[in-house]
């Protein structure tokens, strides 16, 4: 739910410009449930999950195929995307880090970027109301 704001009530058409951010987290697939729970615990309800493959500094393993060695670079990852009000960002990042960390290479990355607008298609609500 939304916390009531102490300042006067603004009508639906007046954009109350609360800043929004998108958090993208690339994590190990087996950590997805833990991360989802952790985000839920800090009040994040909506998220998008995409299966991904990636490689960073983690070097792939080698496989033998028809007598030749190949390096398999891409490792399965999961990408989680969440759009939040600015004031929820730090809590969400902390939740993701705590839940996704194994202290091993390949734990993943988190990227934060500004969101200019959000619209709920069904109702036409915009901004924070659309999250």
Model-identified regions with their sequence ranges:
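Positively charged, small/polar-rich N-terminal and surface patches that mediate targeting and assembly
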Residues: 2-131
């Amino acid at each position: 739910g939304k916390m009531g704001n102490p300042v006067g009530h603004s009508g639906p058409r007046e954009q109350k410009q609360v800043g929004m951010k998108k958090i993208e987290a690339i994590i190990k697939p087996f950590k997805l449930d833990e991360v989802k729970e952790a985000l839920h615990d800090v009040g994040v309800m909506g998220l998008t999950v995409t299966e991904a493959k990636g490689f960073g500094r983690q070097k792939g393993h080698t496989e033998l195929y028809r007598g030749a060695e190949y390096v398999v670079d891409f490792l399965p990852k999961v990408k989680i995307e969440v759009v939040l009000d600015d004031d929820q960002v730090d809590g969400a990042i902390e939740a993701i880090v705590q839940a996704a960390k194994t202290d091993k290479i390949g734990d993943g990355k988190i990227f934060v970027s500004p969101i200019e607008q959000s619209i709920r298609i069904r109702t036409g609500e915009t901004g924070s109301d659309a999250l």
